[in-house]
From Swiss-Prot:
Protein name per its UniProtKB record: Putative HTH-type transcriptional regulatory protein HQ_3058A
Chain ranges of the HTH cro/C1-type domain: 132-186
SUPFAM superfamilies for this protein: lambda repressor-like DNA-binding domains
Keywords: DNA-binding, Transcription, Transcription regulation
Compositional bias of kind Acidic residues: 200-211
Stretches for region Disordered: 189-211
Organism of origin: Haloquadratum walsbyi (strain DSM 16790 / HBSQ001)
NCBIfam families recorded: PRK04140.1 (NF003162)
Length: 325
């Protein structure tokens, strides 16, 4: 299956599951392919045939954007370099959770979260340690007795009861011994943080030299500006004074070319899904106020405005207001 067909299939699956899905980010660079929202759940999704194609820089940017937009970065893919992804298993690449299409279908359509995650050494599960301790004590078993049943040390059993994760083989043994499961579902929409190796997210990249002027003006207008390296937009502006009703911004900046117009359309679609406003700053007068929901503001207009509040008002007047979840 081609990557384009895979993206189409995943998009259709998300729509069937009740997600509002953005237009595909059919431009380069792009750290994700689509954004999708269902209620309060927002996903920034990268769709790959081979998940090992996700590089460190893209993974880091997806995690940064997830933090700025209150979203879950997620990869859906078919295989690694060596094998197909297994169903009901969460993998990780550069700190980003990775699911197979079948696992994504179970999670988003059927409402069945995965139980297993891949880590160095094999496949593991979360163990409900409190339940395990209760069941062991109800049987009147000592730590040593259960350790003997499992073929592990007494100290290891104690760690399971304290919340240490277990191999899938141990989880199966526990279920056979007590005739009930002890595995806890993974919170994929929370980034599966309970099992993900903590990988520090790098700082924001420096803005392009051509964008520094725009960054300075937005900062003066009350936004914390986070430049991007591979996103479909140049920066995310976090509103430091949301009382004025602007909220966060997706921003672009360039001459108003055919490519810029396409990028502004995509930003409008992303803004609708991520519940942010979008604004594109142009080097020349675009002869219009907006492309779909993305405000167009020329750099000459920016330079002519001294009052930071007026800049916010200009963006608010020309951009589409975000809708509530």
């Amino acid at each position: 299956m081609s990557r384009s067909a895979l993206v189409g299939n995943i998009t259709a699956m998300l729509e069937d599951a009740g997600f509002l899905v953005s237009d595909r980010c059919a431009i380069r660079p792009k750290s994700f392919d689509v954004a999708a929202r269902r209620g309060e759940d927002l996903v920034l999704l990268k769709i790959l045939g081979n998940v090992d194609a996700l590089d460190r820089m893209t993974g880091a940017e997806m995690r940064r954007l997830g933090g700025y937009l209150d979203a879950t970065p997620l990869v859906i893919g078919v295989r690694t370099r060596d094998e197909d992804l297994k169903p009901n298993v969460v993998y990780f690449r550069h700190g980003v959770p990775v699911l197979s299409p079948d696992t994504a279908m179970d999670l988003f359509v059927e409402g069945v979260p995965p139980l297993i995650y891949a880590a160095p050494g094999g496949l593991y599960v979360n163990i409900d340690g409190d339940l395990l301790a209760d069941e062991r004590e109800e049987r009147g078993w000592s730590l040593g007795r259960l350790a003997t049943e499992l073929g592990v040390s007494r100290r290891t059993v104690s760690k399971y009861e304290d919340g240490m994760n277990a191999s899938i083989e141990i989880a199966i043994q526990l279920e056979e011994v007590f005739d009930e499961p002890f595995s806890s579902p993974l919170e994929v929409m929370e980034g599966a943080e309970s099992v993900r190796d903590s990988e520090p997210t790098p700082d924001d990249p420096d803005p392009d030299a051509d964008d520094e002027h725009v960054v300075h003006i937005l900062t003066r207008a009350g936004f914390t500006v986070h430049p991007t390296a591979r996103a479909p937009f140049k920066a995310v502006g976090e509103d430091d004074d949301n009382r004025r009703g602007v909220m966060s911004l997706l921003t672009g900046h360039s001459s108003f070319t055919k490519s810029a117009k396409k990028r502004a359309r995509i930003m409008s679609s992303l803004g609708e899904v991520t519940q942010t406003r979008a604004v594109y700053f142009t080097e020349t007068d675009a002869k219009r106020d907006a492309v779909k929901g993305t405000a167009l503001v020329s750099c000459a207009e920016l330079d002519a405005v001294d009052d930071p509040a007026a800049i916010r008002d200009l963006i608010r007047e020309r951009s589409q207001k975000p809708t509530e979840a």
